[in-house]
Amino acid sequence: MATIQSETDCYDIIEVLGKGTFGEVAKGWRRSTGEMVAIKILKNDAYRSRIIKNELKLLRCVRGLDPDEAHVIRFLEFFHDALKFYLVFELLEQNLFEFQKENNFAPLPARHIRTVTLQVLRALARLKELAIIHADLKPENIMLVDQTRCPFRVKVIDFGSASIFSEVRYVKEPYIQSRFYRAPEILLGLPFCEKVDVWSLGCVMAELHLGWPLYPGNNEYDQVRYICETQGLPKPHLLHAARKAHHFFKRNPHPDATNPWQLKSSADYLAETKVRPLERRKYMLKSLDQIETVNGGGAVNRLSFPDREALAEHADLKSMVELIKRMLTWESHERISPSAALRHPFVSMQQLRSAHEATRYYQLSLRGCRLSLQVDGKPPPPVIANAEDGPPYYRLAEEEETAGLGGVTGSGSFFREDKAPGMQRAIDQLDDLSLQEARRGLWSDTRADMVSDMLAPLKVATTSHRVPDSGPEPILAFYGSRLTGRHKARKAPAGSKSDSNFSNLIRLSQASPEDAGSCRGSGWEEGEGHTTSTEPSAIPQREGDGPSIKDRPMDAERSGPELFDPSGCPGEWLNEPEWTLEGIRGSRAQGLPARHPHPHGPPRTTSFLQHVGGHH
């Protein structure tokens, strides 16, 4: 076990936590206090010396903040020797990427995404007060503090790429931000400000919900292409001012076009750069609104009678997507600021409280935010933001102290009838998705007792009140590991293509497929996932769609209609002489009155007609 020593303290190196481009991070024991710390170790050379000087300058600026209230990592000290630089920080548990990896990149529920977003926005608001741009916000740089004691309490780390705004605003082409989270103004070469971090946070929020990066471009062209295909082209005045516009766009040859610019095709980019564009997205979205429909987000629209918990979660997801749309805008001046985002209904929970206060989902969401903001030895700060106040700080809901997780207050709240807003809009979004996949289930956090009761009503409603699906569900555009980088094209499941021959339809008065000699196991017989055509059916069959009567055996012979034989009936009344053919003819020949079905003789209408006919 190695030991390193500064002027004031001594550290025992326990293990190496990770290695990166510029150095490694080790876990150490601080002898003076007995606490575990994280030590960032870099080689002592001229290049890394410039990086260290920049990070130290930013860390000294951030040192004036309360790291717990500002949600930034606590910096302890810096020292060096002839070979290496050492930066000592508080030890945190793991970053969001590692947390996603442990959970197989399962989608994170909206209420946990809000808990993370709230804290990162508070950090960005504090950094803005110091005129600091973090410039490298991503899941790897958002650390979970202690997931067991304080679920989803996070802090922002790594100020190695951070900059003072006044020092970088005039840099022509700064190479900042990881590509997946790089703002359009950096990609296009436009003036930028601290709102580049807001774009990155919007991408992180979408990634936590999707379980996959929203825009995982292999290069800057792919990055711009992904954004254009989901959000449309930037406005012409942006491209006119962008220094790098010609790298990704070209002039529109049609003079009457509404936009004088158009995105270069993949073939154009390949011809110019000899670099083949790649498709690395998991979901090919036609708009940011379609984020709402991914990973079970549209399930409530397929319930005939969704319960209150499902409605609350669905409304929360819609509110989250609205905030993401405000964060991911082409123009930075239209992008929401950190302080304004803290007052957004999704973060402040005002909309959730007003419409779904009586639900357990709201109570769990409120408690999750309070736990994430609570600092040891201090009372938890209020969560719900005052929308009328300018500063991004908070006031507590009046009923918060009386509303516990075991029960909720408010007598009339349970009897309000809520309706899922915008159901038809969500259905239309589902129909617009270009690719689809079976829905992945939501997963709970490490404290399963906090979410099991909330998810149970949704499962019951989903199984007991199901109506026909409103539209297709999204699938993987590419399927592979985020770590290995190997991507495999996923085959389209049954039901994703239409049957152009309509051979799976059975017309009335025609024989069924087995009568025509089809083999056992056909789609018509099994009822789900198979058809008699070589292509799958356009309408996926669900449980209960097949015939409810037991199928006729395959070897049964179809016969024509049989004549009725009255002699086979067990009763004797049909064999009486009056009902035989000879008896009927004989009764007519003898002029006997016809038998009437009425027990008391012919009806009065018949007697009247016979009377009138006798006079004529």
Swiss-Prot record:
Catalytic activity: L-seryl-[protein] + ATP = O-phospho-L-seryl-[protein] + ADP + H(+); L-threonyl-[protein] + ATP = O-phospho-L-threonyl-[protein] + ADP + H(+)
Biased composition (Polar residues): 497-512
GO CC annotation: cytoplasm; nucleus
InterPro entries for this protein: Kinase-like_dom_sf (IPR011009), Prot_kinase_dom (IPR000719), Protein_kinase_ATP_BS (IPR017441), Ser/Thr_kinase_AS (IPR008271), Ser_Thr_dual-spec_kinase (IPR050494)
Record carries keyword Kinase: yes
Source domain of life: Eukaryota
UniProt-listed Enzyme Commission number(s): 2.7.11.1
Gene3D superfamilies in the cross-refs: Phosphorylase Kinase, domain 1, Transferase(Phosphotransferase) domain 1
Keywords: ATP-binding, Cytoplasm, Kinase, Nucleotide-binding, Phosphoprotein, Serine/threonine-protein kinase, Transferase
Binding site for ATP: 17-25, 40
Gene Ontology BP term (one): regulation of signal transduction by p53 class mediator
Positions of modified residues (Phosphoserine): 512
Major subcellular location class: cytoplasm
Domain Protein kinase: 11-347
Compartments reported by the entry: Cytoplasm
Basic and acidic residues bias: start-end ranges: 542-560
GO molecular function: ATP binding; histone kinase activity; protein kinase activity; protein serine kinase activity; protein serine/threonine kinase activity; protein tyrosine kinase activity
Enzyme class: transferase
Keyword ATP-binding applies: yes
Active site: 136
Annotated region (Disordered), positions in chain: 487-616
Post-translational modification: Autophosphorylated.
Family: Belongs to the protein kinase superfamily. CMGC Ser/Thr protein kinase family. HIPK subfamily.
Chain's role: Protein kinase that phosphorylates TP53, and thus induces TP53 repression of BIRC5 promoter. May act as a corepressor of transcription factors (Potential).
UniProt protein name: Homeodomain-interacting protein kinase 4
Species whose genome carries this gene: Rattus norvegicus (Rat)
